[in-house]
């Protein structure tokens, strides 16, 4: 018996709708397009056209599979990703549009690096993308959609892609042949880094398994029953892969290398904690189209590592939630800062953030940038800023030297360095915030007549810092009452109160940057 396109589509739409498929009409058309090999436009225009018995039989078989909740991508054997169709089957994760953010980030970083010295001489984005070659490692390539998209967009790039699944590797190789990139990709059967030589890479990228087993019951039937669990679920509350990458990645990165990873939308704080504790910087957290945290950009601290602890006592659930949801809004970046027109003050090592929050509250038209690697303190600032509706601040929970690289010269109206660790033992003094080289950098960041405030409750450290400033800095002391009088709007912090209770006297050095050329 023959049926028209309209009858077939209507019947399929009703059946798919009955089992809760979100877009039943569209999926019915996709299945029929796959069977007839005719464009959807043709199917919509020729609704009264009769289908052959063979076409109807083939369509019904595919529809039965979809009614059993098999993903449509597996049924038709392809899935679009980054404007290209990739071969997929039950051995690989189905590409998601959220993962395209990861590809965007890597391309953006390549463009940014090439722009540093070439953009003014180039005429097109294509020229920027082909200027310099890059070596990329992808961990857990699956279908190869990430690696192959990068190869297609970045012609001078070479990639090594690994996967633990032999069947997934076959799919990735088929896609590399489809897009004619086999000469620039090496696909290796490896469990993470195990089979790699000691090659160095510009970027390590991965969309690792990150779903905890406890979330399984909340997931769609078609995902649980059909997609490979090894590509979805991870131990350690979904964080196992991030720990493996954090532990091993440094030895495979070039000096300026980056790690770009997809994360679950509620995992930013937990993943950040893992990498911070392994000696990395969290450079940026990117959001997807639904404004969920989706991709994290990471770089090793190397010789510029911070000596402070990243975590004091364990983060509470509330603190983790604040770091996940609020920190990305207030995370310092060059992009956020470059168009800044307000007065700007930098506080280095803000501790629990009492001073930073108070200054921001009293001076709503001024931007305050806080640097602190201690995540409990960062979470405390986010908590109190939300309670008091304070938004005129940015946070940098990383090493000081990294933000100094991103701040333009002559951009700061003031710098606060309040009660930094004195590192009293001689062999530890190299860890102090102040040294000759960093002092020069700090004064260059200050505007002419900008202020630097230094405070310490350790008398020897205070006067050693003063001697260093007098010998190497272009500053004038603008306040002197035996250095006991703090700057305007100062509040006694918990640390300062502890010093008072211990009979230690806090001294404040208030300096003005003398007129000089930058």
UniProtKB/Swiss-Prot annotation:
Entry binding sites for substrate: 207-210, 425, 457
Enzyme class: transferase
Reactions this protein catalyses: L-glutaminyl-[peptide chain release factor] + S-adenosyl-L-methionine = N(5)-methyl-L-glutaminyl-[peptide chain release factor] + S-adenosyl-L-homocysteine + H(+); guanosine(46) in tRNA + S-adenosyl-L-methionine = N(7)-methylguanosine(46) in tRNA + S-adenosyl-L-homocysteine
InterPro entries, per database record: DNA_methylase_N6_adenine_CS (IPR002052), HemK-like (IPR004556), N5-glutamine_MTase (IPR050320), PrmC_N (IPR040758), RF_methyltr_PrmC (IPR019874), SAM-dependent_MTases_sf (IPR029063), Small_mtfrase_dom (IPR007848), tRNA_(Gua-N-7)_MeTrfase_Trmb (IPR003358)
UniProt keyword annotations, A-Z: Methyltransferase, S-adenosyl-L-methionine, Transferase, tRNA processing
Region annotation (tRNA MTase) ranges: 305-518
Residue numbers binding S-adenosyl-L-methionine: 140-144, 163, 192, 207, 347, 372, 399, 421
EC number: 2.1.1.297, 2.1.1.33
PROSITE patterns assigned: SAM_MT_TRMB
Molecular function via GO: nucleic acid binding; protein-(glutamine-N5) methyltransferase activity; protein-glutamine N-methyltransferase activity; tRNA (guanine(46)-N7)-methyltransferase activity
Active site residues of this protein: 421
Region ranges (tRNA (guanine-N(7)-)-methyltransferase): 301-518
Region of interest called HemK, as start-end residue ranges on this chain: 1-300
Top-level taxonomic group: Bacteria
Residue numbers spanned by region RF MTase: 1-302
Matches recorded under NCBIfam families: hemK_fam, PRK01544.1, RF_mod_PrmC, tRNA (guanosine(46)-N7)-methyltransferase TrmB
HAMAP family according to UniProt: RF_methyltr_PrmC (MF_02126), tRNA_methyltr_TrmB (MF_01057)
Function of the molecule: Methylates the class 1 translation termination release factors RF1/PrfA and RF2/PrfB on the glutamine residue of the universally conserved GGQ motif.
Family: In the C-terminal section; belongs to the class I-like SAM-binding methyltransferase superfamily. TrmB family. In the N-terminal section; belongs to the protein N5-glutamine methyltransferase family. PrmC subfamily.
Name of the protein this chain belongs to: Bifunctional methyltransferase
Organism: Rickettsia prowazekii (strain Madrid E)
Lineage, broadest ranks: Bacteria, Pseudomonadati, Pseudomonadota, Alphaproteobacteria, Rickettsiales
Gene: prmC/trmB
